[in-house]
């Protein structure tokens, strides 16, 4: 039976740390296993994405799509977040709710190109909302609760998106 004071790691499973650069007699003196001069001999150097001459992963993967320069950046808000803010007393359900009110209540962080209303969650309060755009489910939920939803998105663009 093995005793606790006789426990030891398996033979060959541990290795002492090698202190490099401690004289020629140590076997790892002078250049400390880094070879002679050059970029890789210097401290703090590792070339990001370099895989030793093998084609790097970011170049092996195919390119796809593009980033539109005219992309709009909307603050997206779900119905449950608005309901939560009303319950917490941060928003007044009787007052008109727009991007500025949502920002002040901390529901959104910023509204660069406007607010888009999404339909997740249940709306219990009768609200008067003014947003840039809204999904069909969000619009239906606001109207079902007896509220009013006004969108500031240009009408021509709204009609085109409804047809698509």
UniProtKB/Swiss-Prot annotation:
Quaternary data: Part of the 50S ribosomal subunit.
Homology family: Belongs to the universal ribosomal protein uL15 family.
Protein name (record): Large ribosomal subunit protein uL15
Origin: domain of life: Bacteria
Pfam families on file: Ribosomal_L27A
Database matches in Gene3D superfamilies: 3.100.10.10
A GO CC term attached to the entry: cytosolic large ribosomal subunit
Functional summary from the UniProt entry: Binds to the 23S rRNA.
Ranges for region Disordered: 1-49, 143-164
């Amino acid at each position: 039976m093995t005793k606790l004071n006789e426990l030891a790691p398996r033979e060959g499973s541990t290795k002492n740390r090698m202190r490099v650069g401690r004289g020629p007699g140590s076997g790892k003196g002078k250049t400390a296993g880094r070879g002679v001069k050059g970029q890789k001999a210097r401290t703090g150097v590792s070339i990001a994405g370099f895989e030793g001459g093998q084609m790097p992963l970011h170049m092996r993967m195919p390119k796809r799509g593009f980033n539109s320069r005219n992309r709009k950046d909307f603050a997206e808000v779900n119905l449950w977040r608005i309901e939560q803010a009303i319950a917490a007393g941060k928003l007044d359900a009787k007052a008109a709710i727009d991007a500025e009110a949502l920002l002040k209540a901390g529901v959104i962080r910023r509204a660069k190109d406007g607010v888009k209303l999404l339909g997740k969650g249940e709306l219990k309060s009768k609200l008067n909302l003014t947003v840039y755009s809204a999904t069909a489910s969000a619009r239906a939920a606001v109207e079902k609760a007896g509220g009013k939803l006004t969108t500031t998105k240009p009408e021509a663009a709204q009609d085109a998106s409804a047809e698509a």
